[in-house]
Each structure stands twice: as structure tokens, then as C-alpha cells.
């Protein structure tokens, strides 16, 4: 049975993340390998795994949502469009090793923005993550969003959509975003009720408890500052609960 895993990490880069950002970056860097290694202990294999990073802050303070490319941690069904240096790849045991190194390098080079508010545009980032170009191959699939923040999210109903860095096609209410998750839009290829998973590392501030209560397929960890080791287990159990 082929098993395909996509993970989109959404990382708040507001300045108040400073005290935990190094732990989070280590967590993100190590999580794909942890998933593979732990799954292999069950005598099973992941056919294809991709990961990408989205960073967000506060639009009012000039921080846009930024997207990385997909990094092919394992398996290369779509690797033909990868523009990596072939000479460098030839010195590494495999292209997946190269991609893992590039992924970790990208994560390590994430820097925080200076800002003065304790709110961020986490809901807009979540909306864009839902619309990721998810892989549609494989007999079994997991499409996972992991969001890290210490902030309350700005309300969609109060967003200033005239700011030039504000993305297009963002829901205008939390209810509309909820519907987008529960009933994925047609352009979101591969995302289904069976494949989707949302993992929230955020405090008990708006809207994270509300999302945990109203959305399906959600794991919520309000103790992101303290529980990284336990969270690894939460992620694994979430991804492989019915595989």
C-alpha cells in the first residue's frame, strides 16, 4: 500500500516568539525524520513525504505571509521540477538526503520580525495553508497543517483588506473559514475528510479553542512552550491513527 504524507508548517515570526523560536525550529527540522523513523518501527514505509514552510506575522506592521517550495523529504514523484544543483547532489548519497538538508537549512534561516502587537494573522495563514497544492497520489494520504503561535489571531471580520500585502480570496468570517475546512474547496486537490489533519500549537486565546471545538480532525496543544517531546507523539498518533 502506498502512503503519501504532505506537511505544511505555519510559523508565527512575531517578535514575542523569541523565547521559543529555536525549539520550534528544531522541532520542525526533526519532525519529518521522526515520523519516518517511528513509522518504520511498525514495519511500514512512507512512500512519499513532502514538507513546506509558511511564515506569518501582522499585515498592519508590514509582515506578509511567505511560502517556501515543497521539500521532497522522501520519494520524488514530482521531483522533475526540482532545480537543485546536480553537482552538489552527486556528492550526497541520495536526492532525499539533499532535500532534507535543504529543508533544515531553510528552517534554520527563518528570522523573527520586530513588531509591537500581540496579535497576528494566523487565520489568514491557515486559510492559505488549507489551499496548498496537496498531493493527490497514493492509496493512503495524510495532508497535515501544523501551526505555531503565541498570539491571539486578528479577527477576519475586522481585517483591513486594503493593505497591499493582504492576500486574495481570504474568508471574511471565521464561520466561512470553518466551512472551508469542513468542506474543502474544489481547487484543493487531494484534501479530503479522511486525509486532512490540523495540529495547533497555540495558547488558549481566540480563536484556537473555538477552532478545536468546531473543526474536525484537529489536535490542540495549548502548551507549546513546554511539551515538544509529548507533541511528537501527538503528531504521530494523529497522522497514523487509522493507517
Predicted region positions:
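C-terminal "exit" segments of structured domains
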Residues: 215-243
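VWA/integrin I-like adhesion module and closely mimicked acidic/polar interface patches used
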Residues: 151-212
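Von Willebrand factor
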Residues: 3-148, 153
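Solvent-exposed loop/turn segments at secondary-structure junctions
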Residues: 13-17, 58-61, 115, 150-155, ...
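Extracellular/periplasmic catalytic domains that process cell-envelope and extracellular macromolecules
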Residues: 2, 44-47, 136-141, 190-193
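Phosphate/oxyanion-binding active-site loops and adjacent basic polyanion-contact surfaces
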Residues: 17-27, 115-125, 170-173, 228
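Surface-exposed beta-strand-to-loop junctions
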Residues: 2-11, 101-109
Amino acid at each position: 500500500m502506498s502512503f503519501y504524507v504532505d506537511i505544511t508548517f505555519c510559523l508565527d515570526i512575531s517578535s514575542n516568539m523569541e523565547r521559543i523560536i529555536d525549539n520550534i525550529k528544531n522541532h520542525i527540522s526533526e519532525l519529518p525524520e521522526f515520523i519516518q523513523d517511528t513509522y518504520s518501527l511498525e514495519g511500514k514505509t512512507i512512500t512519499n513525504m513532502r514538507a513546506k514552510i509558511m511564515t506569518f506575522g501582522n499585515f498592519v506592521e508590514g509582515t506578509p505571509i511567505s511560502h517556501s517550495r515543497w521539500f521532497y523529504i522522501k520519494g520524488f514523484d514530482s521531483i522533475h521540477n526540482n532545480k537543485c544543483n546536480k553537482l552538489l547532489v552527486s556528492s550526497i548519497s541520495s536526492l532525499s538526503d539533499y532535500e532534507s538538508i535543504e529543508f533544515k537549512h531553510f528552517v534554520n534561516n527563518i528570522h523573527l520580525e520586530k513588531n509591537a502587537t500581540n496579535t497576528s494573522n494566523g487565520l489568514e495563514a491557515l486559510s492559505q495553508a488549507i489551499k496548498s497544492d496537496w498531493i493527490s497520489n497514493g492509496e493512503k494520504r495524510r495532508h497535515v497543517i501544523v501551526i505555531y503561535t503565541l498570539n491571539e489571531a486578528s479577527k477576519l471580520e475586522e481585517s483591513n483588506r486594503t493593505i497591499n500585502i493582504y492576500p486574495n480570496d481570504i474568508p471574511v468570517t471565521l464561520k466561512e473559514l470553518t466551512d472551508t475546512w469542513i468542506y474543502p474547496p474544489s481547487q484543493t486537490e487531494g484534501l479530503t475528510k479522511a486525509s486532512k489533519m490540523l495540529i495547533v500549537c497555540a495558547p488558549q486565546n481566540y480563536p484556537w479553542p473555538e477552532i478545536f471545538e468546531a473543526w474536525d480532525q484537529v489536535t490542540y496543544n495549548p502548551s507549546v512552550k513546554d511539551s515538544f517531546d509529548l507533541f511528537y507523539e501527538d503528531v504521530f498518533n494523529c497522522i497514523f491513527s487509522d493507517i
